[in-house]
């Protein structure tokens, strides 16, 4: 997650902001996947280190973390555009003011919502396919919260 993960994602994000350059969807996905996707992925993987999960399930959890992390960041972009500052506890539309590239700016609000929902559904599908029953209910709740939050 270091120089080829979160750090690289943050660097690319800062550079695009400094250059005030427009990014395409692939660029946005790369930046957000490296930043928030890798952060959530690492958190999920650290949480399972002491488990007895086999390698296949560990890979599935890694994929879950990456997808739900990306969904979280997309939804964060959406909230910056549509949220209520009194609920969020921070000013809205700060991404626009700071010339940040966001999913909403690149592909619009409707498509951003669609992609975030799709990633959340894929994430939950990964968990369901692991066959671990109730032991993953907290992760499923986390995934649902990440894209249904209002702050």
Locations of the language-model features?
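All-alpha prenyltransferase/terpene-synthase fold signal
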Residues: 1-151
